Amino acid sequence: GMATRVQLALRNLLAWVRQEEGRAKLDDVLTMNVRNKYITRYNPGHLRQSASKVETKWRLLGLDISTPAAYAIVESMEDLQAARRVVESRESFVVKRDDAYGGEGIIVVRGRTGETYETSRGPMTADGIVKHVRKIVQGQYAGLALDGKALVEARVEASPVFAAISAGGVPDIRIIVFRGYPVIAMTRLPTVASNGQANLHQGAVGVGLAVADGTPVGAYQQSQHRWVDRHPDTGADLSAFPVPN
């Protein structure tokens, strides 16, 4: 049956990985360096160079896959007025740099009272948010690049499954697919330290998930270099929460 064929395919894949990576054991931790070696070896270089959130959004929409609505794409100073109109007309949204990594430049706007916006960086005004967009376009988070592109998009609400065990923000699930097969999965849970961002570098907790059924297999807070059994803020048990299909 189908299950037998999938098991056989996975068994063959694991045997191939053993041959390719003979120096490492399969139960070793997949470090960033090892992961990056796999990325470099098995992916065309131009894919990493074009890791654009906007481009990814258009590709997903073309495949009829849901993605947060884009309110504004700001590529130049001439686009700032459009960004301001979006900011002033909405109470909830997210500002991101198009191709930043590690959560750099993100502002999450959860609501507003009058002219004051409740954000992941504390109270802000429309002027302050637009100023942040301008800094993104001017290249503040662009590394060696001279300029950048900002994206203002809809804010995603957390699933009730994760809202109960996370400190605000929106947890996500990441799955590494190797040669067409899902091999490793994890969820990233925001904390107070990460300011509601599901970003491990900022303080979020990473919880490994069994690919077969989503069962938690261990939780680690990278920013504190420690394994944890419970969420540091909510106290939720991170060894037994359910992840539905």
Segments the model singles out, each with a brief description of its role:
Residues 43, 66, 90, 134, ...:
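Short, structured coil/loop segments at alpha-helix boundaries
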Residues 1-92, 97-120:
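Conserved N-proximal alpha/beta basic substrate-recognition cap immediately N-terminal to
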Residues 229-245:
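Extended, compositionally biased non-globular segments
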Residues 62, 113-114, 121, 214, ...:
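Intrinsic-disorder/low-complexity loop/linker signature
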Residues 52, 85-87, 166-169, 245:
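Short, glycine/acidic-rich beta->alpha junctions
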Residues 54, 78-81, 127, 131, ...:
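Generic alpha-helical secondary structure signal
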Residues 47, 207, 236-239:
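Flexible, active-site-adjacent loop/turn segments at secondary-structure boundaries
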Residues 120-225:
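Phosphate-binding site of ATP-dependent enzymes
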